[in-house]
């Protein structure tokens, strides 16, 4: 069983990886798109690395935010960003696969973009899984704290009743005892 610290550490590493992939994908996509504009009329997949890079970048930023603030809303936001990153990466790969020709001068850039998309898809998948683990851990922790708090307040109520009985206060019957 992983501890919360291990999950958060892994989430931070994956988030930094996603930010790096996002920046790299945007850079490769921008170069690829500018070269595609010079060579031929732009096609649908020429700018897809930029958009998937933006999705990966947002996923990484939200992952760091999620690791710092472990609230439910931030975890939901991060999960949504991971899903957007998955969709962006898959669409990027599909568009580039349709556009890429091995004889094209853009082939190495398209291959690099597809590789970045595959790594980004894997990172988003792992990040989603880690977020679910973190949410489960936080839910158990909050339940345990609430249970401890209720037990503590029950003990305090019993103590108050016994103090009143020993101080000559009104006698109360509690669980069949005077």
UniProtKB/Swiss-Prot annotation:
GO biological process: negative regulation of canonical Wnt signaling pathway; negative regulation of cell growth; negative regulation of cell migration; negative regulation of cell population proliferation; positive regulation of apoptotic process
Main location: cytoplasm
Protein keywords: Cytoplasm, Membrane, Transmembrane, Transmembrane helix, Tumor suppressor
GO cellular component: cytoplasm; membrane
Residues that span the membrane, as ranges: 11-31, 47-67, 73-93, 106-126
Membrane topology: Multi-pass membrane protein
The keyword Membrane belongs to this UniProt entry's keyword annotation: yes
Tissue: Expression is significantly decreased in lung cancer cells compared to normal lung tissue (at protein level).
Location(s), subcellular: Cytoplasm; Membrane
Function in brief: Acts as a tumor suppressor in lung cancer. Inhibits tumor cell growth by inhibiting cell proliferation and migration and promoting cell apoptosis. Inhibits metastasis of lung cancer by suppressing beta-catenin expression in the Wnt/beta-catenin signaling pathway.
Name of the protein: Transmembrane protein 196
Gene source species: Homo sapiens (Human)
């Amino acid at each position: 069983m992983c501890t919360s610290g291990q999950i958060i550490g892994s989430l931070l590493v994956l988030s930094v990886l996603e930010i790096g992939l996002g920046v790299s994908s945007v850079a490769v996509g921008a170069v690829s798109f500018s070269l595609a504009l010079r060579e031929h009329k732009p096609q649908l997949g020429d700018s897809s690395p930029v958009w998937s890079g933006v999705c990966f970048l947002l996923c990484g930023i939200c992952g760091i935010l999620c690791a710092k603030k472990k609230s439910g809303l931030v975890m939901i936001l991060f999960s949504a960003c991971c899903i957007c990153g998955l969709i962006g990466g898959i669409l990027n790969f599909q568009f580039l696969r349709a556009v890429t020709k091995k004889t094209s001068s853009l082939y190495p850039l398209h291959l690099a973009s597809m590789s970045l998309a595959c790594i980004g898809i894997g990172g988003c998948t792992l990040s989603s899984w880690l977020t679910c683990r973190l949410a489960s851990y936080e839910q158990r922790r909050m339940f345990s704290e609430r249970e401890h708090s209720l037990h503590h307040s029950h003990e305090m109520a019993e103590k108050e009743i016994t103090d009143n009985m020993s101080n000559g206060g009104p006698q109360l019957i509690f669980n069949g005892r005077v």
